[in-house]
Amino acid sequence: MNMRKINFTETVLRDANQSLIATRLPYDKFESILETMDKAGYYSAEVWGGATFDVCLRYLQEDPWERLRKIRAKMPNTKLQMLLRGQNILGYKHYPDDVVRKFVEYSVKNGIDIIRIFDALNDVRNLEVAIDETVKQGAHASGTICFTTSPVHTLEKNVAMVKDLQKMGVKSIAIKDMAGIMGPKDAYDLVSAIKDAVPELPVVVHTHCTTGLAFMTYLKAVEAGADVIDTAISPFSGGTAQPATETLAYALRQLGYQVDLDDKVLVKMADFFKGVRADFLADGTLDPISMATDTQCLNYQIPGGMLSNLISQLKMMNAIDKLDEALAETPKVRADLGYPPLVTPTSQMVGSQAVQNVLAGERYKVVGKEIKAYCRGEYGRTPAPIDAKIQKKILGNTPVVKGRFADSLEPEFEKTKKELGDKAKSDEDVLSYIAFPQVAMAFFEDRATGFKKKKEAAPVKPAAPAAPAAAPAPRAPFAGPVYYAAVPVPQTPGYVSRAIQPFAASYQPSYLKMGDREDCTGNFTITIDGKPYQVSVAKADTPTAAPVAAAPVAAAAPAAAAPVAAPTPAPAAAPAAAPAPTAVAAGETPVNSPMPGNIFKVECKPGQAVKAGDVLVVLEAMKREIEVSAPVDGTVKSVSATVGTAVNTDDLLVVLG
């Protein structure tokens, strides 16, 4: 019997929840289990990096650095691991070398022991600085291959990359199969080749269950000599996440391998995370699509985190019916762009571009700033040449980058620290701002107020259905202000404006009464019949007549009390989250938003002369910056766009004359 020891890395606090619930796992949801996890006997726990940093700032009202420090304090006996995107650190573009070094330094200072470092294009030039600084800080640098398949990805190229990583000083080699497309033979052949090339380096294997291959892949990888595998505690395993920790531990012991995990601790962990999973299922964050086995992923190669985010983004755009089209478009975009492995940030770029191609009805009509930078060579050397016609359509006459792009970037850390002044309370804040300027600044401002604004603007959910009543009594007139939420519901022909009580949600309204508290205006996410909608709430005129009882709910609708009608809002009270399309005078050219998003920058002002192609407005959408350019030469007549405002497709941004 082979008694070789196999180590386990637990992913529930990072990649498993990133894959299944788009990283929406707040610290207070898992704090109470950390000390128990620390006793499980894991080789390491992946707790940071990837999308956790962005999501903490953007959605969870958490300082990611503080989150890491708290985990470190609760888990002193387990090596903490993070995922770093090489020269991209945890952002979506390349950063100067001084920023990369500072980020690694402070990651280690705040508690990280192992840094798994990868580049989305497998360009080793983008790994050098991060690996060098990790070694200098005394941490474990795990050099990573992003596994993918294409006409240009070969076993020989992977082995050559491994040898380059060894020369850089890595302490292990990780194989990152972000889409779950590595089959058992792929794993056996690749691990065997790596072990032959660099026998002194441990090999770590990471995959996803998306296609159903993962368990077989891990067993063959271990047979070939893999030393560590990534798994997730069972309630957060499967689907787009990793295989179950308990199952692999059981199987490997049966095959004669040594596994030093404490099964009793694993049971406690599983019981705890069953409750967490149930909460996310109940509120719709955990989508059944992410839990399913999808063999089509063998074709479109979308990784777990990318798939859950793609679903979330399409839902927010009320375009989930376009999911199959977006998935089919993804491999086409990937081929156009030179077969990049689909891992952050290229997965977001390729996936978002596929969505835009589908929604716009024309391929590459709308192109994000990041895609332009990619085509210019700012992300590194592509595995294969970019389609020349596509590159020309995207770049025009813009020249491409020669050499390593980071060599052309000026140092940024000290300059930014000085500019921020007392807005940044620490060097960690400076790094957060450099990675995500707008998001971090909004976080700093919210933090200064104790997150008061976000607490007041908490998501509003419809009230539970009331008990049926044969003849509900008319409600007394309400004397205070009434608020209505504009809800874009495609099922409602013509978007008929109608104000109803929350318990009548099955009517799929265009306007939903939000309540009568002192101030409930602003942007919200509300859930109607289990579907989230982005809404903006504006104040309506005070109703002057008592609400009148309406007809009972139709039999096809869920059982509920008869809804009470409310006055239809006056036109003046119609809510608007953003500039709405308006008529323009003859000879003027409207410039509308190509997609839903937030106004990130306004690059023009009234009276300014512009030429076709000049950037007028920059949107932030799907974690990317989308430049909206002038379609013709002209003069800016008016600007409707305001920084920070939410916009929908076709909302008017600028008028040119």
Labelled PLM ranges:
Residues 573-657:
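Structured functional modules or segments
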